[in-house]
């Protein structure tokens, strides 16, 4: 289903929360043409056509109960807090605990996706959905009994699984990889780095982004969804703990 049709079909739909409260999503006011121009000027490139279409329809979807929060925001565009991972991002949703679902925005973007879950506890990056339409459908599923599906899997299971997994490949093991991208990326990184190839990720796949503390160095192979993180000594981590640097 197209994103526009999904958004229109969501408005007015009855949802049942975890506390058995009934909520109804409503469309926010559309974003003005002047605001869209302002967003594109800030980005330095045109908004993806699908996003522009949605913004002229509604700035987002909100619920009748303000305490439940705004589940979907189509206009939340800013620089990613992890600039070594993503540049400009749309944050369509947060979990209320400081963790965000984000979509990287790029010039000439045909698909408004994928959607990633950026979590700080544990500090991981997790693949959520291939596009915003799928994410919205999954989010609606999560907001209705039995409250299951990909969103619940990522929040309740994948974060822990990604934090504890050992699938990240030491940079030294890819110096002579048959994959040109991985080989070039590995040779550009210092010793002690680990690489995670998420080009063909499935919901729940991901990479720890704070394996060696809050200042863990991160890198990305150009525009590809191939990421890496560097190791830090115990002394370096202790310095960060006491000084924040």
Locate the predicted segments by residue.
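Compact, glycine/acidic-enriched structural inserts
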Residues: 113-150
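A surface-exposed partner-binding patch
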Residues: 1-111, 147-245
């Amino acid at each position: 289903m197209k994103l526009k049709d999904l958004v229109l079909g969501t408005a007015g739909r009855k949802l049942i929360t975890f506390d058995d409260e009934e909520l109804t999503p409503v469309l926010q006011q559309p974003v003005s043409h002047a605001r869209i121009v302002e967003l594109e000027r800030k980005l330095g490139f045109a908004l993806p056509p699908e996003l522009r279409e949605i913004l002229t329809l509604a700035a987002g979807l909100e619920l009748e109960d303000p305490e439940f929060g705004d589940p979907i925001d189509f206009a939340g565009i800013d620089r990613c807090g992890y600039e070594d991972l993503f540049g400009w991002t749309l944050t369509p949703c947060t979990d209320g605990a400081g963790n965000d679902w984000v979509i990287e925005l790029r010039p000439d973007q045909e698909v408004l996706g994928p959607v990633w879950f950026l979590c700080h506890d544990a500090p991981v990056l997790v693949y959520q959905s291939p596009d915003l339409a799928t994410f919205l459908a999954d989010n609606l599923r999560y907001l209705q009994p039995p409250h299951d599906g990909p969103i619940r899997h990522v929040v309740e299971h994948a974060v822990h699984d990604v934090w504890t997994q050992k699938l990240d490949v030491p940079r030294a093991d890819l110096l002579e990889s048959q994959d040109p991208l991985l080989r070039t990326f590995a040779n550009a990184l210092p010793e002690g780095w680990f690489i995670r190839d998420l080009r063909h990720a499935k919901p729940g796949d991901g990479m720890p982004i704070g394996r060696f503390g809050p200042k863990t160095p991160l890198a990305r192979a150009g525009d590809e969804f191939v990421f890496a993180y560097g190791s830090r000594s115990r002394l370096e981590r202790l310095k960060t703990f006491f000084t924040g640097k």
